[in-house]
């Protein structure tokens, strides 16, 4: 067992915080009068709270884990991810790219836009199904990341961690099922404040403990110039940087959880302000955890630590599960009792914040865009809320099972980017062409969605299943190469099929 400072006092702090979040869910349940309040908080989200909840849901434990893992694996070169995310978000905020037209249309989900724009209910159902499947797979390893964090920072064994994580997701289900988007927004705000303070204090203590010059020299000793320049790093390169910019646009303008907040905004002006100010948060949510990951790298390197983070030659471990554990183990050894509990509470609360947002998002997509359109009659608000709550429970059960057996095989961030690409490569083509090109048709949209599914070949286990691993390795084809290629083909397919099979006049809504 790895050494940690985690004590009984820290457990009390964490427990008290988690109980408080459940009380919030019970309290806001009285404000839920219909599906609009449950899914998009009655479209009453103002600028300041919108910024906090947008950053709060994205600044989760999973974000901290995969960002810290990238800092540990790539050094300061990993900072390009946050920089690309910040630039992409501010561009979306200034231009209103995609999100402003969606808010004007008054849609609650992206598949709902498919039907309004192209006049095809079947397209909405098909698109909603792909979105939900990709989204659920995308968050499939969130529980594993949470389990690794809890075991690393507290020192408890793996079997006990499984029960702790199961209890946590049950708490998430309770207040999300009761309060919907209103409880999500309120808890996101609280967790945003707690986690932000906790991470900043951690950075200060880490620099005081290690020293800035030691950090720079340590990264140089481990990675040389590759630890500072992403364009020459073997694991990164120019194509990966371009992929990160594209992911930055997707994260804020196409990914359903962010779009839900744009749709919940009070007005178009609020949407733009949310994105402009959130751009700093989208950047910092990567930079701070990456910096902590770099601190962990140098800390364990200077200690002369070998197992489990380094091999006998001083090389960083290539086991993704091991490198992901570096940050929580580092926190457990760095922070004093009490402060460690506060930071752990903030991190675990952030884990819950991400889960409540994503669970509600994918359950609502299945309800609004798959099951409800399949009905011969329109479901009542009461029926839709009941179905959404049922789906929340079923998705949570799947996540527990998936997180226990899926072999990671690559950095968590790369897994999330590729699994999300199953949806967003096609969706980006449909949104961009559909919103800004009048001739975009339903046939083109179908082709983009179908082509986008091929992004699944960026996942290692899929390559192994189809015996393609040797081909990908021999040709040095990585997940981001697959994602960029599929995105280009999806846009091309959208254009070709739209020109070849145009929509009939009058079967779509004007943008």
Protein language model annotation of sequence segments:
Residues 1-511:
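Membrane-embedded helix-loop-helix hairpins and adjacent transmembrane boundary segments
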């Amino acid at each position: 067992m790895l050494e940690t400072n985690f004590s009984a006092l820290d457990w009390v702090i964490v427990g008290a915080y988690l109980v408080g979040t459940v009380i919030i869910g019970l309290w806001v349940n009285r404000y839920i009068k219909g599906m609009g309040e449950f899914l998009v908080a009655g479209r009453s989200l103002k600028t300041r709270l919108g910024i906090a909840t947008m950053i709060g849901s994205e600044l989760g434990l999973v974000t901290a884990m995969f960002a810290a893992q990238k800092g540990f694996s790539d050094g300061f070169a990993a900072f390009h991810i946050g920089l690309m995310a910040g630039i992409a978000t501010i561009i979306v905020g200034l231009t209103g790219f995609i999100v402003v037209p969606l808010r004007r249309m008054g849609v609650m989900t992206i598949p709902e836009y498919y039907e309004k724009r192209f006049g095809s209910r079947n397209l909405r159902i098909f698109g909603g199904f792909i979105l939900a499947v990709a989204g659920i797979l995308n968050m499939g390893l969130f529980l594993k990341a949470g389990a690794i964090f809890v075991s690393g920072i507290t020192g408890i064994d793996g079997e006990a961690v499984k029960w702790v994580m199961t209890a946590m997701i049950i708490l998430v289900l309770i207040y999300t099922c009761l309060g919907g988007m209103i409880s999500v927004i309120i808890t996101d705000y609280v967790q945003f404040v707690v986690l932000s303070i906790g991470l900043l204090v951690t950075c200060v203590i880490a620099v005081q403990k290690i020293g800035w010059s030691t950090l720079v020299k340590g990264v140089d000793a481990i990675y040389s110039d590759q630890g500072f320049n992403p364009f020459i790093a073997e694991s990164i390169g120019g194509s990966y940087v371009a992929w990160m910019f594209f992911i930055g646009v997707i994260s804020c303008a196409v990914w359903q959880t962010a779009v839900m907040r744009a749709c919940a905004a009070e007005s178009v002006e609020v949407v733009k302000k949310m994105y402009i100010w959130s751009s700093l948060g989208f950047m910092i949510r990567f930079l701070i955890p990456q910096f902590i990951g770099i601190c962990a790298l140098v800390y364990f390197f200077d200690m002369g630590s070998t197992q489990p983070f380094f091999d006998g030659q001083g090389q960083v471990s290539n086991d993704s599960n091991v490198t992901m554990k570096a940050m929580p183990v580092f926190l457990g050894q760095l922070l004093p009792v009490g402060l460690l509990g506060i930071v752990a509470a903030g991190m675990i609360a952030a884990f819950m914040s991400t889960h409540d947002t994503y669970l509600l998002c994918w359950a609502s997509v299945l309800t609004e865009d798959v099951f409800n359109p399949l009905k011969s009659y329109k479901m009542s608000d009461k029926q839709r809320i009941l179905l959404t709550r049922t789906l929340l429970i079923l998705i949570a059960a799947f996540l527990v099972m998936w997180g226990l057996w899926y072999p990671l095989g690559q950095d968590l961030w790369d897994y999330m980017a590729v699994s999300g690409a199953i949806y967003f490569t096609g969706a980006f083509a449909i949104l961009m062409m559909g919103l800004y090109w009048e001739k975009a048709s339903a046939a083109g949209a179908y082709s983009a969605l179908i082509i986008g599914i091929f992004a699944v070949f960026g996942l290692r286990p899929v390559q192994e299943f189809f015996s393609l691993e040797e081909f990908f390795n021999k040709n040095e084809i990585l997940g981001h190469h697959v994602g960029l290629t599929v995105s280009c083909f999806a846009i091309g397919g959208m254009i070709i099929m739209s020109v070849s099979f145009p929509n009939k006049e009058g079967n779509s809504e004007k943008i």
